[in-house]
Amino acid sequence: MEKYNSLSDFLKEFYIPTYVLSAETEEEEEEESRPTPASPVLVFINSKSGGQLGGELILTYRSLLNHNQVFDLDQETPDKVLRRIYLNLERLKDDDFARQIREKLKIIVAGGDGTAGWLLGVVCDLKLSHPPPIATVPLGTGNNLPFAFGWGKKNPGTDRTAVESFLEQVLKAKVMKIDNWHILMRMKTPKEGGSCDPVAPLELPHSLHAFHRVSPTDELNKEGCHTFRGGFWNYFSLGMDAQISYAFHSERKLHPEKFKNQLVNQSTYVKLGCTQGWFCASLFHPASRNIAQLAKVKIATRNGQWQDLHIPHSIRSIVCLNLPSFSGGLNPWGTPNPRKQRDRGLTPPFVDDGLIEVVGFRNAWHGLVLLAPNGHGTRLAQANRIRFEFHKGATDHTFMRMDGEPWKQPLPLDDETVMVEISHLGQVNMLATHDCRSRSVFDPSTPRHQDGAEDYDDNEDDSVAEGEEFRKFGAADTFKIPDEGEHSNKKGRASRRRNSNVHGWSHVL
């Protein structure tokens, strides 16, 4: 109580007393007359993100708020913390103050996209009657989730002034729903001696929180099969971009002394892309085969009708995108010409419309198009569900990535039933600032139709000569360096309008 009394009126609007957080603490008499805070927050910080910034943020938040409402994700997992707090809130259901805390509760998560996705997944799994909306502090490298909802891309300051400024934004932020996407992979149980469990990069032991085999008692389990499940909010990718991301993570773990600054990291990323065939297709890189060789792709629209999706043989990476920010704020979907949009039956890419945008890339040079005004990848489809049916014997493994978390996925060569399916699974609440780039289908301020002031691209064949891309840009910025020290999980979508301040050359690979 002493600390609460010493706080400014502003900070009191975020403060949660300990008795609300823990069953082991009793309410003090003075707390009975305390006004309910306008924006009570639980703060989760990945102390390994952003170099030393995560640890510094923990110290600042704990100095400003109740020490017990600020959590270090390296010490406590969010599922255990939230279960404990919500069990206590249930115990206090007849306490009017605690009830109002529960109704007004917000979550702040500081880390990279994987950390933010981790919190999103936990909140979804809890199936709360009043799920708290989430604000994201950009502490990673790409910071796609924070950028999509107006929280910025740059790592924040960690002093009192910076933290109070962020809290003020949280106080004013609006709640926006975004779609959850569920991913299911099923295959026959491998013969003795073979394992098809996902293989995480060496330095990401938590990354498979996002994608794991279901237990024998899970309703999704099927006898005679291995079933894996996961979820994402921003994107799922299959193919070369995931392969390079995986290689980068593994290389950094083996030789950390080589990854001391951003420029060296980016050069290494490019080198890995070259050696593995991402910049130039090669007969010597069978793992870089195109998507059509790996799998048959089907999509379903809202009416539930499945249809084959034609994938050009030049496409070697496919991205299923929900938010307007990919690889550090780039927009692979772009802004289709209105006439051609109508001809193809496309709709604006809202984050809560139950549709996901499917985009393809030929190689890293193709990705350079995103740096140009109106640049975009190959727009393949919008879908409510998408299914990949892997061809028997096509490969013994592939690479996948969800919201910045890559893994190597072994595949049985003698199985013709390997299937990955992505489907819509509810929504989660995000906090968005006035700079939010994501658009809601239910927001009256969101334009339903593109107008003449919008910049459109007429390049609907989704292609630019690779030589022209090289001549204009000289380097690829498509697939950014992933977050260091990330835990794991899920989602983000691409902005309807291009960011006019597209990355400076310091960010180009």
UniProtKB/Swiss-Prot annotation:
Keyword 4Fe-4S annotated: no
Superkingdom, taxonomy of origin: Eukaryota
GO molecular-function term, one example from the UniProt record: ATP-dependent diacylglycerol kinase activity
Known catalytic reactions: a 1,2-diacyl-sn-glycerol + ATP = a 1,2-diacyl-sn-glycero-3-phosphate + ADP + H(+)
Top-rank EC class of the record's enzyme: transferase
UniProt feature, compositional bias: Basic residues: 490-500
Region annotated Disordered, chain positions: 439-509
Pfam families listed in its UniProt record: DAGK_acc (PF00609), DAGK_cat (PF00781)
Domain DAGKc: 36-187
Presence of the UniProt keyword Kinase in the record: yes
Compositionally biased spans, kind Basic and acidic residues: 439-452, 468-489
GO biological process, one term: phospholipase C-activating G protein-coupled receptor signaling pathway
Similarity comment: family membership: Belongs to the eukaryotic diacylglycerol kinase family.
Quaternary state and interactors: Monomer.
Known function: Phosphorylates the second messenger diacylglycerol (DAG) to generate phosphatidic acid (PA), another important signaling molecule. PA is required for plant development and responses to abiotic stress and pathogen attack. May be involved in the accumulation of PA during cold stress.
Protein name: Diacylglycerol kinase 5
